[in-house]
Amino acid sequence: MNDCDEVNNISYDPLYRYSQFYTLLTSIFSVFPLLYLIIFKLRVCTFNDNIKFLYIVYFTQILISVLNNCVVFAHHVVIPFLAVSKCDLLVNPVKNRIFQNIGVFGISCPMLTILGITAERLLALIFARCYENVKLHIGVFIGVFAMLCDMALVYFFFLDEKFDQPSISYFMVPDTSGYKMNWLCYSLLAINSVNLVFNYFLVKINTILKEKWRNSLSTRYQMEENIITTKFSTFISFIHVFFFSLYLIFTLIIRLLGPGFLKTQADLMSVRGVYITIPTYNLIIGIASCVILRHLQRQKVAKVYAEVTLKYSGIDGAQIHQEAILNVWKTKSSGRK
């Protein structure tokens, strides 16, 4: 069977078609919460400029991945309606090179950027007493450095690929790069799992030091922001690790057990993790991040308000009132002398 016959059998298989429609619709719906999060939540939030910039970079990278999915899955959904011959269903080599590069970048770059966010939060903890006045340069440097590293990673990933033959799917990594993809996925999962644990302990350390570093209002404010943003980073990291683990587990199960109950190549391709877990993650991360960010910001406002507001009732209120009266009498007494 040649490629034209194979892609024809795959493209019109019912299960495969359903998976393409699911992924396309999920990707389209993912755009809106991500745009809302970036434009109406992160852009106007009161976080330090460095961490705010990195969050915007991170979710913009995910948005790029989502838009890439919208284009390539729209191709796989629409072309079968328009194809005149079987070979029309094949993916052009030039388009395949472009969108596969963007696809790998969209998956790997957010996982490097989240490491940069952790590094920035560590710096914010170390320099908590003066970090309020730190310029945007740190966030820009970390964000650009993460993207340059990932671009180099993608370049070397496809270095030996010629992309001189049409492909059945945009998401079929060439056989010569298959081992690289496995290495990349497992390495990123391991690194991000360690990062998740590190973020958890970073929240604990921030909470402990917040009670000790109370020498100024600005320091207390910075420590409170450190706790809120590190919790948000921990949440993002957890969702990323969870879904990426599901993706790898799902892929291994299909690879090992799939041939036993999925009889055709089309059925095997239709239930690949890339068609299910990654689009679902892209949808959930936008919605869940909006919800958790709103919750954490309300928590931050309440705690900061409690820090700077005087109590007017109870024992604390009576003590504050007494101290204020004593200060007035001391001032009057000093004036008479």
Curated annotation (Swiss-Prot):
Membrane-spanning ranges: 20-40, 62-82, 98-118, 138-158, 183-203, 234-254, 273-293
GO cellular component, one term: plasma membrane
Main location: membrane
Expressing tissues: Expressed in the ADL, ADF and ASH chemosensory neurons in the head and in the PHA and PHB chemosensory neurons in the tail. Low expression also observed in the egg-laying structures in the mid-body region.
Keywords from the named record: Cell membrane, Membrane, Sensory transduction, Transmembrane, Transmembrane helix
Keyword Ribosomal protein set for record: no
Molecular function GO terms recorded: transmembrane signaling receptor activity
PANTHER family given in the database record: SERPENTINE RECEPTOR CLASS BETA-1-RELATED, SERPENTINE RECEPTOR CLASS BETA-1-RELATED-RELATED
Name recorded for this polypeptide: Serpentine receptor class beta-6
Organism: Caenorhabditis elegans
Source lineage: Eukaryota, Metazoa, Ecdysozoa, Nematoda, Chromadorea
Gene for this chain: srb-6
